[in-house]
Amino acid sequence: QYQDFDITYFVSDDVFPTFEVFDRSRFGDMMIQQILPEKNRWCWLMQFMDGNRLDLKIQPVSVVPDYLAEDTLNTILLDKTGHYTNLTATSDRTHWVQRPTQSEFDDSITEFFWVSTYVLKGILRGELLYANTFFESIVREELYRLLTWRIGRDTDFSLSVGKAHKRLPAYFEGIESLYDLSDLTGTGQALSTALKMANDLLPSLSHDLQLTYDVASVERTTDYILRQL
């Protein structure tokens, strides 16, 4: 119960177009579904009344090699053609943390500190929704990018932090406090915590990744925001 299943059926190219009206009622008592139009595939996201969810795709058999290369977690359960018997073992390799380039590192740091000033502005103006929107959608996400790179570097970029960064709390204390945004005081504290985490992280992270960043700009921005909070 409460399981998510991702299943793809591959059909011959000539019959693939007919599956646009594929009968999906056989899978169970459906609560709601979402149909995603995608190139060279039919895709239905289905939530059933028993709590299970099925993401079902139907694709032409000609795309199997590209499909398998796209995500190393894919595995073949049944192959009626016999063409795909010598596959490598499944792994989450395609989801591992990737080493950042200098440009990606620069962009993340700049975005984090630049948008932190928007959050501060919202707090000082008493605009909670404005402040929270920028904190949740950008500031916290960019902090998570930095934290993820730290984990990647420490593990030789050989693991995934999971969907929605779900494994981050196992590596860093204080993550949960970044979600206490019910009032301006909470948002201010969350912003302060995020700034502290970033400032504590950046010197060692940049050194270990052999990347650079504008230290003076980071220090000026951090000092300005913390004095205003």
Where are these regions (language model features)?
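Glycine-rich loops and low-complexity Gly/Arg-rich segments
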Residues: 11-16, 31-36, 70-72, 79-83, ...
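A short, charged helix-loop
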Residues: 74-107
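A general structural signal for short secondary-structure boundary/capping elements
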Residues: 50-59, 91-92, 102-104, 181-182
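Conserved nucleotidyltransferase catalytic core and NTase-mimicking acidic/glycine-rich helix/loop elements
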Residues: 96-229
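Metal-dependent nucleotidyltransferase catalytic core
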Residues: 1-3, 7-63
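Acidic, glycine- and histidine-enriched catalytic cores of nucleic acid- and nucleotide-handling enzymes
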Residues: 47-87
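Short aromatic-enriched loop/helix-cap "lid" or pocket-rim segments at secondary-structure transitions
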Residues: 1-2, 68-70, 161
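Short secondary-structure transition/capping segments
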Residues: 30-39, 78-89, 173-181
